[in-house]
Amino acid sequence: MSRRVLLINGPNLNLLGKREPHIYGSTTLEDIETQARQQAHELGVEIDTFQSNHEGAIVDRIQETAGWGPNVRETDTPGKRVSAIIINAGALTHTSVAVRDALAAVAIPFVELHVSNVHARETFRAHSYLSDKAVAVICGMGAYGYSAAIEFAAKHLKIEGE
């Protein structure tokens, strides 16, 4: 399997750069994805990006990483399979057992990511359904958190792959 990472962004992250810039900054998701592709290329890693405001679509995409899911046929090539997942699940972090279960089912190492420091915000944001299953959690680093997650994933994959 090639060193491929899937970057998932959940609900409202398509509004980065517009929504509450005093919390989330002015960098857009498009900017983040462009930077992610460039950085991944420099690190010798392929990266796929996916954003959805819909929980089921995110669950489907996670399942596809293992060759499963409603949109995968037995004749499909494993083109959507990955070695690691970086996920900013947005509000689904605090509510979605379905996303947690999908990540646990595929058993692919994942990094949980948040642009803001969720522990310095409303109390409900401090609880994550994902953290105890993640190999790493990054929060409060703004858009730079994506770069840190990609670097970590690339190094983790290199260690695992050698």
From Swiss-Prot:
Homododecamer. Adopts a ring-like structure, composed of an arrangement of two hexameric rings stacked on top of one another. One of its GO terms (biological process) is quinate catabolic process. HAMAP family: AroQ (MF_00169). It catalyses: 3-dehydroquinate = 3-dehydroshikimate + H2O. Keywords: Lyase, Quinate metabolism. The record marks 19 as: Transition state stabilizer. GO terms for molecular function: 3-dehydroquinate dehydratase activity. Pathway: Aromatic compound metabolism; 3,4-dihydroxybenzoate biosynthesis; 3,4-dihydroxybenzoate from 3-dehydroquinate: step 1/2. Is involved in the catabolism of quinate. Allows the utilization of quinate as carbon source via the beta-ketoadipate pathway. It comes from the Eukaryota. This is Catabolic 3-dehydroquinase. PANTHER family: CATABOLIC 3-DEHYDROQUINASE. Signal peptide: none annotated. Its EC number is 4.2.1.10. Belongs to the type-II 3-dehydroquinase family. The gene is qutE. It is an enzyme of class 4 (lyase). Substrate binds at residues 88, 94, 101, 115-116, 125. The active site is at residues 24, 114.
